[in-house]
Amino acid sequence: MTRKQRRLFMIFGALGTLGVAVGLILFALSDNIVFFYGPTELAEKAPHPGARLRIGGLVKPGSLEREAGQTVHFIVTDNKHDVAVTYTGLLPDLFREGQGVVTEGTLTGKETLRADSVLAKHDERYMPREVADALKKQGVWQEDGQAKPATQGAAAPLIR
Protein backbone atom coordinates (compact mmCIF):
# COMPACT_ATOMS: atom_id res chain seq x y z
CA MET A 1 0.00 0.00 0.00
CA THR A 2 1.39 3.37 -0.92
CA ARG A 3 1.48 6.31 1.42
CA LYS A 4 -1.39 8.04 -0.44
CA GLN A 5 -3.60 4.93 -0.28
CA ARG A 6 -2.89 4.52 3.44
CA ARG A 7 -3.80 8.16 4.08
CA LEU A 8 -7.07 7.86 2.11
CA PHE A 9 -7.90 4.62 3.93
CA MET A 10 -7.37 6.37 7.31
CA ILE A 11 -9.48 9.39 6.30
CA PHE A 12 -12.40 7.29 5.03
CA GLY A 13 -12.14 4.99 8.05
CA ALA A 14 -12.29 7.98 10.42
CA LEU A 15 -15.26 9.48 8.54
CA GLY A 16 -17.07 6.14 8.63
CA THR A 17 -16.45 5.77 12.36
CA LEU A 18 -17.64 9.34 12.95
CA GLY A 19 -20.81 8.69 10.91
CA VAL A 20 -21.60 5.55 12.91
CA ALA A 21 -21.01 7.42 16.19
CA VAL A 22 -23.32 10.29 15.17
CA GLY A 23 -25.98 7.79 14.07
CA LEU A 24 -25.82 5.97 17.40
CA ILE A 25 -26.05 9.23 19.35
CA LEU A 26 -29.09 10.39 17.36
CA PHE A 27 -30.76 7.01 17.82
CA ALA A 28 -30.13 7.12 21.58
CA LEU A 29 -31.47 10.67 21.89
CA SER A 30 -34.54 10.17 19.70
CA ASP A 31 -36.63 9.12 22.72
CA ASN A 32 -35.65 12.30 24.58
CA ILE A 33 -36.48 14.80 21.85
CA VAL A 34 -39.77 16.54 22.65
CA PHE A 35 -41.33 19.14 20.35
CA PHE A 36 -43.27 22.18 21.60
CA TYR A 37 -46.64 23.09 20.10
CA GLY A 38 -49.35 25.61 20.77
CA PRO A 39 -52.96 24.42 20.37
CA THR A 40 -53.30 26.09 16.94
CA GLU A 41 -50.01 24.63 15.69
CA LEU A 42 -51.15 21.22 16.88
CA ALA A 43 -54.45 21.58 15.00
CA GLU A 44 -52.66 22.65 11.81
CA LYS A 45 -49.87 20.07 11.75
CA ALA A 46 -50.72 17.35 14.22
CA PRO A 47 -48.09 14.65 14.68
CA HIS A 48 -49.16 11.02 14.78
CA PRO A 49 -50.89 9.67 17.92
CA GLY A 50 -48.32 8.32 20.35
CA ALA A 51 -45.87 11.17 19.70
CA ARG A 52 -44.27 12.83 22.73
CA LEU A 53 -44.68 16.58 22.80
CA ARG A 54 -45.17 19.68 24.90
CA ILE A 55 -48.23 21.87 24.63
CA GLY A 56 -48.32 25.36 26.05
CA GLY A 57 -51.11 27.85 26.48
CA LEU A 58 -53.67 28.95 29.02
CA VAL A 59 -55.92 26.71 31.10
CA LYS A 60 -59.41 27.42 29.76
CA PRO A 61 -61.70 28.82 32.47
CA GLY A 62 -64.42 26.35 33.46
CA SER A 63 -62.62 23.36 31.98
CA LEU A 64 -61.04 21.88 35.11
CA GLU A 65 -62.64 18.56 36.14
CA ARG A 66 -61.35 16.32 38.91
CA GLU A 67 -62.06 12.60 39.11
CA ALA A 68 -61.77 10.38 42.16
CA GLY A 69 -58.10 9.99 43.00
CA GLN A 70 -55.59 12.27 41.35
CA THR A 71 -56.85 12.28 37.75
CA VAL A 72 -57.58 15.73 36.35
CA HIS A 73 -59.02 16.81 33.00
CA PHE A 74 -58.59 20.34 31.67
CA ILE A 75 -58.30 22.22 28.39
CA VAL A 76 -55.25 24.15 27.20
CA THR A 77 -56.19 26.97 24.83
CA ASP A 78 -54.66 29.82 22.89
CA ASN A 79 -58.15 31.32 22.35
CA LYS A 80 -58.30 29.89 18.81
CA HIS A 81 -57.97 26.14 19.34
CA ASP A 82 -58.26 23.86 22.36
CA VAL A 83 -56.43 20.71 23.43
CA ALA A 84 -57.97 18.39 26.03
CA VAL A 85 -55.45 17.21 28.62
CA THR A 86 -55.71 14.32 31.07
CA TYR A 87 -53.20 14.25 33.91
CA THR A 88 -52.84 11.84 36.81
CA GLY A 89 -50.79 13.20 39.67
CA LEU A 90 -50.46 16.21 41.89
CA LEU A 91 -50.90 19.53 40.13
CA PRO A 92 -48.53 22.40 40.93
CA ASP A 93 -49.72 24.71 43.71
CA LEU A 94 -50.03 27.63 41.29
CA PHE A 95 -52.12 25.71 38.73
CA ARG A 96 -55.34 27.65 38.09
CA GLU A 97 -57.85 28.25 35.34
CA GLY A 98 -56.81 31.16 33.14
CA GLN A 99 -53.12 30.73 33.99
CA GLY A 100 -50.23 29.81 31.70
CA VAL A 101 -49.26 26.15 31.63
CA VAL A 102 -46.91 23.80 29.77
CA THR A 103 -47.87 20.13 29.67
CA GLU A 104 -45.66 17.32 28.43
CA GLY A 105 -46.97 13.93 27.46
CA THR A 106 -48.21 11.61 24.74
CA LEU A 107 -50.70 12.55 22.06
CA THR A 108 -53.65 10.12 22.25
CA GLY A 109 -55.87 11.74 19.63
CA LYS A 110 -55.77 14.71 17.27
CA GLU A 111 -56.50 17.17 20.08
CA THR A 112 -56.06 15.02 23.20
CA LEU A 113 -52.95 14.70 25.36
CA ARG A 114 -52.20 12.32 28.22
CA ALA A 115 -49.77 14.41 30.28
CA ASP A 116 -46.84 13.09 32.31
CA SER A 117 -45.97 16.48 33.74
CA VAL A 118 -47.65 19.84 34.18
CA LEU A 119 -45.74 23.07 34.72
CA ALA A 120 -47.59 26.18 35.88
CA LYS A 121 -46.33 29.72 35.74
CA HIS A 122 -44.66 30.58 39.00
CA ASP A 123 -45.53 34.22 39.55
CA GLU A 124 -47.71 36.91 38.09
CA ARG A 125 -45.10 38.09 35.56
CA TYR A 126 -43.51 34.84 34.39
CA MET A 127 -44.55 32.81 31.37
CA PRO A 128 -42.38 30.23 29.63
CA ARG A 129 -40.79 31.68 26.50
CA GLU A 130 -42.38 29.02 24.28
CA VAL A 131 -45.88 29.85 25.54
CA ALA A 132 -45.32 33.60 25.16
CA ASP A 133 -43.97 33.14 21.62
CA ALA A 134 -46.93 30.93 20.67
CA LEU A 135 -49.41 33.49 22.08
CA LYS A 136 -47.64 36.31 20.21
CA LYS A 137 -47.74 34.29 17.01
CA GLN A 138 -51.50 33.76 17.44
CA GLY A 139 -52.07 37.46 18.14
CA VAL A 140 -53.48 37.02 21.65
CA TRP A 141 -50.45 38.34 23.55
CA GLN A 142 -51.20 41.39 25.70
CA GLU A 143 -48.08 43.52 26.06
CA ASP A 144 -49.55 45.53 28.92
CA GLY A 145 -50.84 42.41 30.65
CA GLN A 146 -49.11 40.59 33.44
CA ALA A 147 -47.69 37.81 31.28
CA LYS A 148 -44.11 38.56 30.31
CA PRO A 149 -41.76 36.04 28.68
CA ALA A 150 -38.89 34.64 30.70
CA THR A 151 -35.45 35.65 29.56
CA GLN A 152 -33.52 32.58 28.68
CA GLY A 153 -30.38 32.15 30.74
CA ALA A 154 -30.92 35.31 32.78
CA ALA A 155 -29.38 35.19 36.21
CA ALA A 156 -31.32 36.09 39.32
CA PRO A 157 -30.23 39.31 41.02
CA LEU A 158 -27.89 38.92 43.95
CA ILE A 159 -29.23 40.02 47.33
CA ARG A 160 -26.59 41.18 49.76
Curated annotation (Swiss-Prot):
Quote the subcellular location field of this record.
Answer: Cell inner membrane
Q: State the Gene Ontology BP annotations.
A: cytochrome complex assembly
One Pfam family name is CcmE
Q: Which of this chain's residues are annotated to bind heme?
A: 122, 126
The keyword Membrane is annotated on this UniProt entry: yes
Keywords, A to Z?
Answer: Cell inner membrane, Cell membrane, Cytochrome c-type biogenesis, Heme, Iron, Membrane, Metal-binding, Signal-anchor, Transmembrane, Transmembrane helix
Which superkingdom heads the taxonomic lineage of this protein's source? Bacteria
Which parts of the sequence lie on the Periplasmic side of the lipid bilayer? 29-160
**Name of the protein described by the UniProt record:** Cytochrome c-type biogenesis protein CcmE
Cite the PANTHER family for this sequence.
Answer: CYTOCHROME C-TYPE BIOGENESIS PROTEIN CCME HOMOLOG, MITOCHONDRIAL
* UniProt KW Cell membrane keyword: yes
Q: Where is this region: Disordered?
A: 140-160
Which stretches face the Cytoplasmic side? 1-7
Q: Which GO terms describe its cellular component?
A: plasma membrane
The job of this chain, per UniProt, is described as: Heme chaperone required for the biogenesis of c-type cytochromes. Transiently binds heme delivered by CcmC and transfers the heme to apo-cytochromes in a process facilitated by CcmF and CcmH.
- Transmembrane ranges? 8-28
Membrane-topology descriptor: Single-pass type II membrane protein
GO molecular function terms noted in the UniProt entry: heme binding; metal ion binding
- Family note: Belongs to the CcmE/CycJ family.
